[in-house]
Amino acid sequence: LVCGCNALLFSGKVVKSYNRWFNKTLSMLQSIKDRQGIDKLTNRMRKMYDKRERFMNDAMHKTSRRIVDYLVSHHIGTLAVGYNKGWKQSVNMGGVNNQKFTFIPFARLRSCLRYKCELAGISYVEHEESYTSKCDALAMEDICKHDSYLGKRVKRGLFKSAVGKVINADVNGALNIGRKVFGDSFMITDSGRWYRPERINVLKCV
């Protein structure tokens, strides 16, 4: 989340950790079920799915509540959210990464954000986010496909800009989504606020 006064990173570590446990345990139970020749879901598997549904609902509601509360407290009137059609259907990042990604209900998070924004009187805008992660926000690179890009990822989670600054890759993407929705005036490139985002773990602090 980036705005005129801060950059926030909402940690997904707890959700990813839960997904790892869920996938590993479910795989073990599936193997046992297959060996025993059982066709239907076992009671334990059904309980696991129910528990995961409650966990994800709780995580999405807490995250969306924290975001909207922040917007209200800082008098921010519009929330712009990046979105790609077929996000979970077409993504292919390898087996392990696919499991982590597709088990996070982003559509549910967007839905929670939308109705909480409406209740708070905040305008909610979704915009396609193509090329926002590749283009250099700090260098005001045009957000479109290029043969070569001004900036690049230098290591996991970090993006090196052509202006010589290194920022969090998610912050770079969020800035570009803001540019798509609000125009380049959204950016203040000489500010240091983007370089040290505040990290928030909602599931631990709520």
Locate predicted features.
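Positively charged, helix-rich recognition surfaces that bind polyanionic ligands
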Residues: L1-V206
